[in-house]
Amino acid sequence: MYKTLLVTLTASALFTGGVAAAPAVTKEPLDAATLSAIKSNFGRLMKLANNHDFKALHGMFWQSPSTLLVAKSAIQSEGNWAGFWGNEAIDQKLHDIGSSGPVVLEPDYSKLRVVGLTRDVAESYVPMNITVSYAWQDGTARPFLMIINWLRVGKDWKVASEIILPVPPVPAAKG
């Protein structure tokens, strides 16, 4: 009993000390105008994707081998969903998806959230429906989540990573 109490008190003291030592975030690192500009960039990204403007889409991404797109894969050895690193791989993936048939991205702009992580990095999150016929998808609108990390490059904000995740169906209620 004494050992249990001692362990509990020690853990409590360590945990409380760790929380007290954590720096408090007091201010958003990006101002409202910057967050609004990133939201506008997101809207432009969606418009370019829906118009299959591959050249302009290329310009929206950070030009780096570290740029990442997570998307559906058509190659079974890559798995069902995969990461595509670097601009050449991303350009090819976007071209393959866009050339497969109709692709429509419909973000729920009322739920679009953009936050600053640092003065030079932001993150956006939005649920959306995507209609696509790529890689065994049947062209039916389905729910997805899109998470983008934005990087300030000079005066512009570029997509450093775009992660598209399918929302799994709600399990049937057990009765």
Give the positions of each predicted feature.
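Short beta-strand edge/turn micro-motifs at domain boundaries
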Residues: 123, 142-173
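A solvent-exposed, acidic/Ser-Thr-rich amphipathic alpha-helical stretch
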Residues: 36, 54, 58-116
